């Protein structure tokens, strides 16, 4: 049966969505899911505390079928009582399997909105980009160092009065005296606290209001108009002004892309500010008590506890707001913001949270990222059936779409297909006999292996798989040794080299998977980078180093005789074709760097790359019949008296002859090229 969910998407979640992940309704009508207490386990009976970060009522029982009271699920025959028997009426814990603690979530209702540190303090900052404000200004606002003055409510306010009805001149002595007196006289009164809550905003609440007031489509149209203005504007000639224009254009592109993504995914920008904080399932942040009484706990638990401590303190201050100075509430909001920042990325905080020994606590970012993170360590590197792994080595004689698969790996991967082929041919009576035959590695099995491998693609994967070229399909051929042979041109897509890198081999089983691998994932169909569109299969490193000595010149061509005392020993030989030149090289009559005259097809479109536009002949010879022989530095032409070309010879080397033949054969589509 196919799974219901075929894919998953990583993105921003709304507060309602986070609550929906965690909230459940008990048969009594009680809604559970909110974590309100920072306690973990009771030291008396070693049971999770109620409404704590390990609560059995929220996350499920520790033991299957056992509630927090220690009662077991009762077996009832009446269907009406069966629903009531699924949970304990005293403690509210459901009688379900303990594995639910691996995926049941909780949530913390924050007393104030806090900004998500990944979207605020990363570079580039998404919040700063979409608001088009300096990052430092937003950080001061998020951490309650600055206040946002404006019409927070829909009612007329002191700072929200229109200029037509209220004009405030800074030079007016009346307003300069009355406003400071107003703030000073009411700064410790309940009315002032109410005024501050209505007129001023700070912390995540202020940023949330700014994001909520954004009209994305209007901003998108404004960016489009401004971009047209800069496109039609010619360079000013001033280096500084042109640089500022370029930076502004780059910023417009970033902001336009970000807004477009928000519109396409139907995501609200204010979701980058958190009011509901999800709590991970307990099994993903375990807390273990050893035999000697020592407790080992995940750092995430301590970070959650600090958030709940500070959030509960802020709730108490807000409930007693009449008697609590506004400055104390603002400081507590800042502490909640810093605690949530430490949960997501402790390294970004100005004062990272540590344990009693001064060690930095590991946050979500530390657990997820890197080679030892959750994705690369536990999810991407899992072992699966019909797969293998080995070191890669260069296979320069292989075509681009083929790879050399070691015989030992091929025999193991294609074993089911070989068993079926052997039974269909009546070579063995049963599967067991076929496996025994394969273990003995009888000689005729290699022919069967080649038959089942023919036309069956394999997938090569090199971790980390950062883009789609990290997994490509190849046609396998048997190779000696225990290493996978790979064409050097495909290494750029894998970001691989031949210094000990390893690759995983996967075998597509179904016909659909084989067709997809052959049509979409074959290496010869993935020649362009998906990110930039530039060619990715280009020669580099060893290939360029090999082409250089193959095509290098070591003497002075036809001028070599000037510097040689024995001209007869330095005469340049003539060859009629590629084969003649390569045959002379194989007989060691010439070497790779020896100059030679190679006959070229007679054509009116002979193009010789030269530093001069029109090269003058070095020497012109005439015979009694009126035929001319013009000798140039890089070629020579024989013509009759009517200026009709009789023959053309070009000056080249044996190495360049080999290189040209290989390029010509590759362009004509030959799959096998004889090495020289």
Swiss-Prot record:
Entry superkingdom: Eukaryota
SUPFAM superfamilies listed in its UniProt record: beta and beta-prime subunits of DNA dependent RNA-polymerase
Catalysed conversion reaction: RNA(n) + a ribonucleoside 5'-triphosphate = RNA(n+1) + diphosphate
Pfam families assigned: RNA_pol_Rpb1_1 (PF04997), RNA_pol_Rpb1_2 (PF00623)
EC id: 2.7.7.6
Protein's GO biological process: DNA-templated transcription
Function: DNA-dependent RNA polymerase catalyzes the transcription of DNA into RNA using the four ribonucleoside triphosphates as substrates.
Subunit composition and interactions: In plastids the minimal PEP RNA polymerase catalytic core is composed of four subunits: alpha, beta, beta', and beta''. When a (nuclear-encoded) sigma factor is associated with the core the holoenzyme is formed, which can initiate transcription.
Protein name: DNA-directed RNA polymerase subunit beta'
Organism: Huperzia lucidula
């Amino acid at each position: 049966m196919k799974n219901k969910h075929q894919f998953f998407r990583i993105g921003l979640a709304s507060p309602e969505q986070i609550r929906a992940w965690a909230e459940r309704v008990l048969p009594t009508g009680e809604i559970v899911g909110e974590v309100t207490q920072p306690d973990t386990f009771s030291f008396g009976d070693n049971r999770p505390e109620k409404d704590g970060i390990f609560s059995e009522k929220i996350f499920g029982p520790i033991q299957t079928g056992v509630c927090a009271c220690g009662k077991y699920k009762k077996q009832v025959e009446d269907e009406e009582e069966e629903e009531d028997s699924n949970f304990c009426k005293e403690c509210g814990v459901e009688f379900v399997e303990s594995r639910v603690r691996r995926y049941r979530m909780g949530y913390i209702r924050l007393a104030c909105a806090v900004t998500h540190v990944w979207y605020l303090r990363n570079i580039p900052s998404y919040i700063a980009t979409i608001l088009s404000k300096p990052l430092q200004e937003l950080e001061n606002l998020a951490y309650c160092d600055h206040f946002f003055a404006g019409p927070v409510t829909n009612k007329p306010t002191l700072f929200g009065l229109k200029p037509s009805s209220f004009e405030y001149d800074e030079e007016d002595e009346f307003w300069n005296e009355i406003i400071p007196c107003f703030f000073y006289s009411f700064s410790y009164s309940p009315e002032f606290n109410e005024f501050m809550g209505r007129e001023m905003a700070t912390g995540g609440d202020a940023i949330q209001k700014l994001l909520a007031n954004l009209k994305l489509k209007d901003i998108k149209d404004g960016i489009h108009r401004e971009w047209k203005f800069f496109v039609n504007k010619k360079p000013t000639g001033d280096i500084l002004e042109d640089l500022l224009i370029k930076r502004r254009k780059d910023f417009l592109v970033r902001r336009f892309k970000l807004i477009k993504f928000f519109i396409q995914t139907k995501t609200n920008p204010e979701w980058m500010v958190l009011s509901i904080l999800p709590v991970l399932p307990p099994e993903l942040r375990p807390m273990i008590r050893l035999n000697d009484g020592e407790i080992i706990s995940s750092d995430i638990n301590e970070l959650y506890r600090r958030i709940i401590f500070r959030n509960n303190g802020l709730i108490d201050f807000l409930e007693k707001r009449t008697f609590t100075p506004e400055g104390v509430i603002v400081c507590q909001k800042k502490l909640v913001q810093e605690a949530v920042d430490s949960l997501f990325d402790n390294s970004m905080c100005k004062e990272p949270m540590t344990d009693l020994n001064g060690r930095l606590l590991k946050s979500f970012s530390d657990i997820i990222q890197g080679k030892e993170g959750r994705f690369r360590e536990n999810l991407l590197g899992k072992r699966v059936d019909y797969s293998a792994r080995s070191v890669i080595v260069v296979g320069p004689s292989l075509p681009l779409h083929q790879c050399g698969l070691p015989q030992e790996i091929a025999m193991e991967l294609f074993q089911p297909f070989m068993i079926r082929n052997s039974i269909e041919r009546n070579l063995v009576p049963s599967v067991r006999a076929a496996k025994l035959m394969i273990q003995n590695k009888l000689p005729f099995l290699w022919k069967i292996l080649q038959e089942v491998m023919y036309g069956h693609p394999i997938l090569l994967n090199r971790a980390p798989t950062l883009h789609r070229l990290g997994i490509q399909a190849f046609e396998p051929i048997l190779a000696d040794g225990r290493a996978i042979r790979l064409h050097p041109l495909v290494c750029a897509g894998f970001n691989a080299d031949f210094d000990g890198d390893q690759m995983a081999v996967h075998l597509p089983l179904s016909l659909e998977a084989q067709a997809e691998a052959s049509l979409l994932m074959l290496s010869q169909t993935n020649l362009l980078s998906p990110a930039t569109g530039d060619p990715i299969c280009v020669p580099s490193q060893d290939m360029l180093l090999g082409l250089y000595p193959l095509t290098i010149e070591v003497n002075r061509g036809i001028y070599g005789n000037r510097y040689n005392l024995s001209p007869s020993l330095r005469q340049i030989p003539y060859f009629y074709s590629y084969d003649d030149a390569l045959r002379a090289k194989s007989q060691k009559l010439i070497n790779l760097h020896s100059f030679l005259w190679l006959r070229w097809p007679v054509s009116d479109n002979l193009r010789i790359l030269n530093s001069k536009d029109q090269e003058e002949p070095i020497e012109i010879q005439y015979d009694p019949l009126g035929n001319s022989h013009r000798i140039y530095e890089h070629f020579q032409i024989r013509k009759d008296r009517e200026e009709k070309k009789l023959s053309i010879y070009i000056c080249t080397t044996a190495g360049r002859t080999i290189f040209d033949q290989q390029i010509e054969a590759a362009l004509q589509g030959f799959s096998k090229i004889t090495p020289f």
